[in-house]
């Protein structure tokens, strides 16, 4: 009777970690391969995935991180962007970080970021 893959898997599952490491080394020597090379190749695939996903992102949150030295200009910019009242905009600017706009398109987020940065504020797109 031949040994099945499942029999081998069950035998490996019952081994200690040290025994499995020894088995891997023996297989590397016997077949002239390296388990590390396979691991690197597998790890390289997922690394490229998130980078591509970040490029494809279509909605951004515009977050005011710091009002900068000219708070009045930052308050005016926040009011113009959000339609908040003077007190609400002042509280938002003083209570950074503050999400100015959620789920904005890339173009809208970039324009809003530029407007806030021209007022002296520090802005992040998330």
Curated annotation (Swiss-Prot):
Q: Which GO biological-process labels does this protein carry?
A: translation
Tell me the domain of life.
Bacteria
| Record-linked InterPro entries | Ribosomal_bL12 (IPR000206), Ribosomal_bL12_C (IPR013823), Ribosomal_bL12_C/ClpS-like (IPR014719), Ribosomal_bL12_oligo (IPR008932), Ribosomal_bL12_oligo_N_sf (IPR036235)
Q: Which SUPFAM superfamilies match?
A: ClpS-like (SSF54736), Ribosomal protein L7/12, oligomerisation (N-terminal) domain (SSF48300)
Q: How does it assemble?
A: Homodimer. Part of the ribosomal stalk of the 50S ribosomal subunit. Forms a multimeric L10(L12)X complex, where L10 forms an elongated spine to which 2 to 4 L12 dimers bind in a sequential fashion. Binds GTP-bound translation factors.
Q: What does this protein do?
A: Forms part of the ribosomal stalk which helps the ribosome interact with GTP-bound translation factors. Is thus essential for accurate translation.
What family name appears in the similarity comment? Belongs to the bacterial ribosomal protein bL12 family.
List, alphabetically, the GO terms of the cellular component aspect. Answer: cytosolic large ribosomal subunit
Q: Which UniProt keywords apply?
A: Ribonucleoprotein, Ribosomal protein
Q: Which GO terms describe its molecular function?
A: mRNA binding; structural constituent of ribosome
Name this polypeptide is given: Large ribosomal subunit protein bL12
